[in-house]
Amino acid sequence: MEQLNICIDIDGTITDAYYWIDLCNSYFKTSITEKDATQYYIHKILNVPLEEYNEFYEKYKYKLHSEQKLRKDVKSVITKLSQNNNIFFVTARERDLTILTYSYLRKKEIPYDSLFILGTHHKVPTARQLNCDLFIEDNYDNALELSKAGFKVLLIDTYYNRKPLNQNIIRFYNWDEVYGIVDRLFEKSEAI
């Protein structure tokens, strides 16, 4: 049986997409909700200058990323997928979050083969390098870029990515749906 190479984003994909709201509301004295998060870029949602948001992020990024909650069923789904497939985490996180990211995945007991911390949202070169069969993502622009490069993408539904999809992108709503989607896409139950 041929193994699939499955690339998975971290923030907003395996973790709660709105993990930042409470801390941002407290810091910026705002009262935004998940439903207000209709854009990917947080400073735009908060209506604050990028520089001001970046100051906040630099101060709190370790707290934000270490305390994120996993989405429901993530651990069990990835564990099952990892039994017959290669799991690669590919994140746009900055490289200074490398140790924290390894520690987070270990603490949450998420199995994987390799972790790639890119420091950029442009994931196509890494997906090519890994011969990616499927990419699981939350960022609409990343999903579009990957899909236009020929990769199949599963896009987890969020308020900020509800835009038109092309034929290489499949929207899903819960991690427990992933088994069936992978099976249909690759027409082999051995993939899961």
Swiss-Prot record:
Catalytic activity from the UniProt record: sugar phosphate + H2O = sugar + phosphate
Q: Give the superkingdom in one word.
A: Bacteria
Taken from the UniProt record, the cysteine pairs bridged by disulfide bonds within this chain are none
Q: Enumerate the cofactors the protein uses.
A: Mg(2+)
- Could you state a single Gene Ontology molecular function term? metal ion binding
- What EC identifiers does the entry list? 3.1.3.-, 3.1.3.23
Q: Which InterPro entries match?
A: 5_3-deoxyribonucleotidase-like (IPR052419), HAD-like_sf (IPR036412), HAD_sf (IPR023214), Nucleotidase_putative (IPR009206)
Query: Which keywords does the record carry?
Result: Hydrolase, Magnesium, Metal-binding
Name the family the entry cites: Belongs to the 5'(3')-deoxyribonucleotidase family.
PANTHER family, from UniProt? Answer: NUCLEOTIDASE YQFW-RELATED
What does the protein in this record do? Answer: Catalyzes the dephosphorylation of nucleotide monophosphates and of different sugar phosphates in vitro.
Protein name (record): Nucleotidase CA_C3379
